[in-house]
Amino acid sequence: MAVFDTPEEAFGVLRPVCVQLTKTQTVENVEHLQTQLQAISDTALQELQQYILFPLRFALKTPGPKRERLVQSVVECLTFVLSSTCVREQELLQELFSELSACLYSPSSQKPAALSEELKLAVIQGLSTLMHSAYRDIILTFYEPSILPRLGFAVSLLLGLAEQEKSKQIKIAALQCLQVLLLQCDCQDHPRPLDELEQQQLGDLLASFLPGISTALTRIITGDFKQGHSIVVSSLKVFYKTVGFIMADEQLTRIPKAQAKPVVEHRVAALMIHREADWVKSTGDKLAIFIKKIIDCVSVHPHWKVRLELVEFVEILLLKCTQSLVESTGPLLKVLVGLVNDESPEVQARCSTVLRRLADQKVVVGSRALADILSESLHSLATSLPRLMNTQDDQGKFSTLSLLLGYLKLLGPKVHVILNSVAHVQRLSRALIQVLELEVTDVKMVEERRWNSDNLSASAEVSAARPWSRVQRRYFRCFTDERVFLLLRKICQLLGYYGDLYLLVDHFMELYHTSVVYRKQAAMILNELVVGAAGLDVEDIHNKCPSMGPEELREIVKSILEEYTSQENWYLITCFEAEEGEEVMMKQQGFQAVTSGVHTCQVVSFPALSKPSPTICSMNSNIWQICIQLEGIGQFAYALGKDFRLLLMSALYPILEKAGDPTLLISQVATSTMVDICHACGYNSVQHLINQNSDYLVNGISLNLRHLALHPHAPKVLEAMLRNADASLLPLVADVVQDVLATLDQFYDKRAASFVSVLHALLAALAHWFPDSGSTGQLQQRSLEEEGRQLPAAGEASTTAEDIEQFVLSYLQEKDVAEGNVSDLEAEEEVQSAPPKVDENDTLPDVEPPLPTHIQIAKDVMERCIHLSADKNLKIRLKVLDVLGLCVEVLQTHKNQLLPLAHRAWPSLVHRLTSDDPLAVLRAFKVLQTLGSRCGDFLRSRFCKDVLPKLTSSLITQAPISARAGPVYSHTLAFKLQLAVLQGLGPLCENLDLGEGDLNKVADACVIYLSTKQPVKLQEAARSVFLHLMRVDPDSTWLLLHELYCPVQQFTAPHPSLHPVQLQGATQPQNPYATNVCHLLLQLQ
């Protein structure tokens, strides 16, 4: 469409349209005009502005009822014209303002007209566009006293729409239009900024509307949350911009005491406000009520954008109205301080920025500095804090502690001065100690034991997470919300950062010593104080550098560390199962859990576990105290960084003691603490940490083993070291191992459990450090031999006499071994092998070469285990059997040492297998499997004579029971024993290369379990037995399976000269063995 740039061309196009609209006011004529206007340039429209507006205004002013659609079209067309032009005449601006405002009012009913939402929205947008189109100085002349009635009329209409309208779009548009009418909008279309005089005149004018605006907006803001966050945000913005402008201290200081009389009608003059001192005080008091209502409601609003706008609300009022709104300063500061720890990062960041700005500008409220008000507020809060922590719910505690944290952040370095007051420190510490009281009645903590040593080993690589943030989850008596605990940690860190650390540490150390009731809480606080003093992860809005040097901090940490690891605070009784010697030692030394009788741990009967008792509570308390102290050591390392290496000699040994503690929680926390130390001190892993400090650790263990009655935890340290070190540690610990074995020989009746755990850790480490490199080759060789057995015997004709001779000699040797003639084994090997040729100058050694260190250790340990395998304590027997299995794994490459020891261990092992507790039978059977895979020929005759008959008899006896049993049977010990035997028999038959008779016994015992009446897991285990039997004797296995179930009635011979084969097996598909037999036969093919 062509664009008409000149007024003449535009007039020629628009004249007939305007004339037609003036004559006939219809929607079509208005839309026709708007269509033509889109083809006119802005310059031409500006020249023809009043000509174009005339028919539109005429249509609005025509008396009589009008269709809403027509009025809406006229307002939209008028808005289009105003958006493209400027209003340059004051009279035109006032008239258009009145005409648009009248569209929203019904003169007949004397209240806002009941219009469609579309028309209301169009009129609101038209008013906003009109005010933006006013030309420069014209807008200022509009705001004169004579306009007060019309302006007040528009303001009341817009407030009514914002409060009562249901449409969210209209509500927001009305609030934005109100902001424009008050000259407080944020857009760039407004004229130049107002000078001081203009601001004062406009403030005097708008002050008349302040009561109505503040009242209506407060109702909107504190309304239902369901109205939507955007409405609350817009209402807050209008409120603080209006109040911040009218009540601005900068304006009010220039207001003269006497009011100049305006040249206006008496009716209008009565509406004028003189903002003198009394009015300011009265209005400030009334606004304080509204502001408190708004703060109480909005500070807990669920939407973060509303809380973010509240921060802007507080900032504007605190920066502009500190003198006029003195009564509101406290609540405003309180909400700002509370929101500094908001869950929304956007709110937190903005709040911190505002706090920093307030601190930098040194805002004065009334005649007092902001810091004085904050100090007074902190004092008041500290006074009521113990009561609030005792009476509030979790949300209340969170809000109160957020407030406390905010005060500390805002006061910053001045906290140091405040904490010089003994009363302040006592109130704060009493509240913190009270709220941090732990719940220690949980029986589960005492029951959770570290039954095996696997929990001792930490991960090889150090986690990348911040160490001190991984605090063990704990439960408190006063709250359950985890956010409250996080706030308490931040508060303690800020106290350590800004306060006098010497004073605070002395105070909480005194509480630590005063009573066992305070000890755990005081330790938690001390840990966080040290982290805060280091300035790590502390949000400092004052940019204060830590005043404490690393040497001073290290000395403080050293003193706390010494207190934590002292005898009376480190060696607390945490379980019922304290060994006798340790218990006696504790009583002799006086190292009870606490000095008072409440937490003295006594050995009680197990029925006491049925309900929480004071004894259980005391042990739980001890567990938590040790865990908190361990976490504290990790936090100290985090605070000191690599400087903590200077304290490792006094810290690492006690931590390793707790890493081997039988209480699961303590063991886990100790291991986690070692990971924290690795973070701080630059070690790659816990293994690296222990290797680098192993010399003094081993020295300490060696010394303490010689005085075991005074140092009963020395074996635990060695156990933890072995779990977390590598083979480079072996030369250092070789002598210590001999000390352990010698001490075990001396105290086996009292301390066998501790030492057997150490031996288990030692052998597990040796098996890991020195794996059998030849095992893979042996497996490959075995598979090749199996393939060779399955090949056709085509090459057997070429067998030589030498081969036959070698076969006979090997057979005789294996027969001797199977019959137990072990002592002659070495002599036979010397006879059969020709002596090597040596040089005449060389001399033959008179003695055998020394064994490798790990082989000698394994040999010595296995000798002790043979004696301990008959111990009366079941737990010790189980652990000894585990150690025996590990010894066999380590010694498998040295048969000359392994076989004699296996010979000596065999009688005890048979007794465990046949006449012991079912748990011991299970464990002994695992040892038997290990022996079978490492020394098969040696074990063959013994196994067949001493063990196999009882195993097969047991399987046959239990088969009917398991076939009839229900699903609960799979949880019984009898089932687990059946399953273990079935799973292990197959490999044993193959490894021991049993003869046909013994294989038949195994097959007869296991064939019952191929029935589908047996539990599924037992069927699977039985199938695994027959899969192994197929490898040893496939023909017999094939025949046995077909006797159970025959898929075909008659086998056709592969050659005509052979007769067909008829088997006796059942052929019915309902046969209970059919499924498993078919599965096995398929595998055999």
Curated annotation (Swiss-Prot):
Disordered: annotated span: 777-799, 822-847
Keyword field: Cytoplasm, Phosphoprotein, Ubl conjugation
Primary location group: cytoplasm
Domain of life: Eukaryota
PTM statement from Swiss-Prot or TrEMBL: Phosphorylated at Ser-823 by CK2 following growth factor deprivation, leading to its subsequent ubiquitination by the SCF(FBXO9) complex. Phosphorylation by CK2 only takes place when TELO2 is bound to mTORC1, not mTORC2; leading to selective ubiquitination of mTORC1-associated protein. Ubiquitinated by the SCF(FBXO9) complex following phosphorylation by CK2 in response to growth factor deprivation, leading to its degradation by the proteasome. Only mTORC1-associated protein is ubiquitinated and degraded, leading to selective inactivation of mTORC1 to restrain cell growth and protein translation, while mTORC2 is activated due to the relief of feedback inhibition by mTORC1.
Pfam families hit by this protein: TPR_TTI1_2nd, TPR_TTI1_C, TPR_TTI1_N, TTI1
Subcellular location: Cytoplasm
Keyword Ubl conjugation: yes
Ubl conjugation found in the keyword field: yes
Modified residues (Phosphoserine): 459, 823
GO biological process, one term: positive regulation of DNA damage checkpoint
Assembly description: Component of the TTT complex composed of TELO2, TTI1 and TTI2. Interacts with ATM, ATR, MTOR, PRKDC, SMG1, TELO2, TRRAP and TTI2. Component of the mTORC1 and mTORC2 complexes. Interacts with WAC; WAC positively regulates MTOR activity by promoting the assembly of the TTT complex and the RUVBL complex composed of RUVBL1 and RUVBL2 into the TTT-RUVBL complex which leads to the dimerization of the mTORC1 complex and its subsequent activation.
Similarity comment: family membership: Belongs to the tti1 family.
Protein name (Swiss-Prot/TrEMBL): TELO2-interacting protein 1 homolog
Native source species: Mus musculus (Mouse)
